[in-house]
Amino acid sequence: MTDDDEHDSHIYLDTAASTPVAEEVIAEMLPYLKERYGNPSSIHKFGRETTRAINLARKRVEEMIGASSSREITFTSGGTEANNLALKGTAMYVKSKMPKKNMIITSSIEHDAVLEPCKDLEDRGFVTMHLPVTDEGFVRPSELKNVISDNNVALVSIMYANNEVGTIQPIKELVEIAHQAGALFHTDAVQAAGKLPLNVKNLGVDMMSLSSHKINGPKGVGALYIRSNLKILPIIHGGGQEWYLRSGTENVPGIVGFGKACELANKRVGQYQEHVAGLRNYLVERVLKEIPRSRLNGLRTERIANNAHFTFFRVNGEDLIIKLDENGIAASTGSACSVKKQKQSHVLKAMGFSYEEITGSLRLSLGMHNTKDEVDRAVDILSSVIKELRELSPFESKYVAEMG
């Protein structure tokens, strides 16, 4: 069997890592990969048509998140760059105007695209504080209220929905607390986009990060929403593209595709929630009922529609992923950006999980492309693989004997 054949027969349950590019998105991108190749900075016909395409895409992003103007949208190379721009650009600007504002508050379960820029800012003299979370991955607003009383906080950055366990955070309430203390608020909404209705005005956020490939768009493009009249510094310097905040010739095909993906996501968010959450709930019900010593992690209700995160006791998660892949299931133990580093999940550690609980964890994330039949097949395979792995474990017979 070729890799292509295996690809066609596999069941893809890893949409938290990336999503298939929608056919409508591909169709909209193609002309900008072929005959519409002008540089948007050029003033001739070829440049003008690519500029118009970027403007349309910017409008579509604006509409998806309920922004006030397309001027509030800055295109980037993805969610990671958007987070870096938000954190570093804001921190450096605020400190240049108000040197005493040198603290950044975030949570202990943020993506590395937030945690690593925070570490970099620490090297530049900033102080970062990581809020604790509950054993369900929830940031209590009271935790923020308790530590933000001093007027030295430049920025609070809390993700809208967690990429591993899917927990949705009370962003609106957290924003109010931050603003009362004179701090700006950024949210990494990479996992929330397309799964939740987004409205930056209702949430009150000052900045919001987005990524194309999480909403059935192409990889290598994202955006940062920056509230009107909010000033931040660029972290990439050059020709002054993207409102002088992100220099470099724009990735026109990617931006066009991202814009179309935003338009589709905005139209289909209700359909997405109904279809995907229905499949997810069915999957969770079957797993917990049919697979012994299994547990769902994260909040039951306040979680994004596509996410199901489990711990299977006395099973090694990496062995489980490999066996599932061999049996036609694509899944993950957690963040795709951390898996290749072979490090334990900092998210699960922050939630108080033991070593056994962390190593026995599995994330299944669904999409619009999945069907009930695929879920049934996946659960059947998962159950069989877990049984096989447990039988091979030297500790299983001892456990069974102890349980009588």
Predicted regions and their residues:
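Pyridoxal 5′-phosphate
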Residues: 1-404
